[in-house]
Design a protein with these regions (language model features):
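Hydrophobic pocket/interface hotspot
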Residues: 49-53, 59, 82, 95, ...
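Beta-strand/loop substructures that line and gate deep hydrophobic ligand-binding cavities in soluble
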Residues: 102-158
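Hydrophobic ligand-binding cavity/cleft-lining segments
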Residues: 2-73
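Short, surface-exposed coil-to-beta transition loops
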Residues: 35-37, 89-92, 111-117
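Intrinsic-disorder/low-complexity, polar/charged segments enriched in Ser/Thr/Lys/Arg/Asp/Glu/Gln
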Residues: 33-39, 81, 90, 102, ...
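Short, hydrophobic/aromatic-rich segments at coil-to-beta transitions
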Residues: 75-83, 98-105
């Protein structure tokens, strides 16, 4: 499904033209300015979901592209540094900004994905996990969808 939200934002996946999530596989890819927002509903409270997303020890459990992580910080904060193993090579990372429900990072000095958790009004045990991909890295969006499916299964299984 593809449509356009007001403001000229392209919508892919299963969000309707007003940007609301529809049925289906509960995943979507939405263009937001210079990024693609790859999202998936998670049947877990937003705080627990965000904590799992910020947990460096769990990244290899759900991210197909992360084979390992080394960091002094278990939960990312602004300024967290370390290295991740990607395609067999260790590369440095730095978290450029972090809040309770959002964080962004650079990998090998290059701005990479953003990560956020969105709340649903009136639904304390459900939220949406989103990975933001720069448009120049659009081919990475399917990897992010797979990552979010694995992430949701991990968080919902707790």
């Amino acid at each position: 499904m593809r449509g356009t939200r007001s403001g000229g934002v392209d919508v892919f996946g299963n969000r309707d033209a007003s940007g609301n999530v529809c049925g289906g596989d509960r995943g979507s890819v939405v263009r937001e300015g210079a990024t693609l927002a790859v999202g998936r509903d998670v049947d877990a409270p937003p705080e627990a979901t965000a904590r799992a997303l910020r947990d460096t020890r769990r990244w290899p459990d759900w991210s197909p592209s992360v084979g390992g992580v080394e960091s002094a910080d278990r939960y990312v904060e602004t300024g967290t540094t370390g290295r991740v193993r990607v395609a067999g090579a260790w590369v440095p990372f730095r978290v450029t900004s972090a809040t309770r429900l959002r964080w962004d990072w650079e990998v090998a000095g290059i701005p990479a994905t953003g990560h956020r958790v969105e709340r649903y009004a009136g639904e304390p045990d459900r939220c949406r996990a989103v990975i933001e991909v720069p448009l120049v890295a659009a081919p990475y969006a399917p990897v992010c969808r797979r990552a979010l499916d694995r992430f949701a299964a991990l968080v919902e299984g707790e």
